[in-house]
């Protein structure tokens, strides 16, 4: 490709509304342009990267035995009503009517469509297992699209769905897809972790997320320093260690009129924060117990996903409001505690090991100090309620936990029979009777993969693609002052034709621009290998080579350039 025949839309300045690095660089590199909130046009440089990511995904999915299909973006509402998600999904589901007043949605996902397709096409257990995938546009009406294509309303996703007669068959395909995903992200050159995850609105049982580690990520990824254990912070088990110490002081009631938060209590009374607890009031699952107290250590955070799995707690978790709390307990939020509490309480494992701690007295403006379980208040039910913190023991008993930010780029689920039962997707079993199919689903956010690669791999000059396979071009030819030097132009043209004939994805910068501008543009869009042709070096029989990823620069004999270049390209 010649730049003179290409839409080369780089920007010198960073747009003000771009918050994260990937958004900034995708705009500056001329990969995307905004059209409306959460909607983007993909320009030639961007679409080249996108198609190359799709190619890697497609190749690995095919190797894993999946079969490609293509389903409509527009989906009839009846399928969503049949699955039960028409009323469950929420405002992210964009609904509309056609001219015949029939309800449709723009698909945020395709479980309903694929289940309908397979129940029509597959009738016997002999046709299973079956794993179908597509690479297709999705639409989710995000309330606050942000971070460019990282969280946009329209995006491209690879979604696969498998169908089985047994749980064992599903597990086998799930294991294959786990490996396929690992292969995909390794080929793309991404530093990632596969972590245990919550199934969320998709539903099902087992689930893993594939998280690209990046400081701009929205998720906390937890992993062991000494083992393969990794989990989303929502699911990571918090292990409490040690034993509860004997009391050293008598419980006392203290006036604390200006201490309505843990931070204020600690500051005003010079208390160690790990000797305080906070009491959070949530809605109960049972109408006979409308409120439940959750008690965690003062410096810990409540894990809502864990908490809502307790049978006493409403799912989804919902905090009680101040009026409800005051009416039932008689005190405001800043004065709540375990002593003389008139609603059921659940305490975190770490809290169960505490002694001589401070908590609200359930009287406005008062706290109890030196509280001890058993002696001063009966031990409530103990449950894992908190987020893990760095340094906690790994749940598998090996090493301690580290926490990093991650960008979710893939998610695999064992759906079980959630959709197939609701939609009566059956096949004839070996015994001749109808058998409800067991399902799995497997998603990769293709557009998000592009952004996450940039988040993880960039410098102050621009993008550094982690793999040659996804760079918009593999080689850039930069002839300096070509339009003033016949020798430079001739050699550049010959090299361009030769590389093209070898199947190398090459961009030839034939613009009438200063060398500095040409270098800056090629570094900005992240071309891995740059060949710089200058008249003086050419006279000496040498060509300059620059590697974007390593920063390596070297002079190569003109006669050896092609062989050296092919070696660096891995004989591509």
UniProtKB/Swiss-Prot annotation:
One of its GO terms (molecular function) is proline-tRNA ligase activity. Pfam families: HGTP_anticodon, tRNA-synt_2b, tRNA_edit. Homodimer. This is Proline--tRNA ligase. It catalyses: tRNA(Pro) + L-proline + ATP = L-prolyl-tRNA(Pro) + AMP + diphosphate. It is found in: Cytoplasm. Belongs to the class-II aminoacyl-tRNA synthetase family. ProS type 1 subfamily. Its main location: cytoplasm. It is an enzyme of class 6 (ligase). InterPro entries: aa-tRNA-synt_IIb, aa-tRNA-synth_II, aa-tRNA-synth_II/BPL/LPL, Anticodon-bd, Anticodon-bd_dom_sf, Pro-tRNA-ligase_IIa, Pro-tRNA-synth_IIa_bac-type, Pro-tRNA-Synthase_IIa_type1. GO terms for cellular component: cytosol. GO terms for biological process: prolyl-tRNA aminoacylation. Keywords: Aminoacyl-tRNA synthetase, ATP-binding, Cytoplasm, Ligase, Nucleotide-binding, Protein biosynthesis. It comes from Haemophilus influenzae (strain 86-028NP). Its EC number is 6.1.1.15. The gene is proS. It comes from the Bacteria. Consists of three domains: the N-terminal catalytic domain, the editing domain and the C-terminal anticodon-binding domain. PROSITE patterns: AA_TRNA_LIGASE_II.
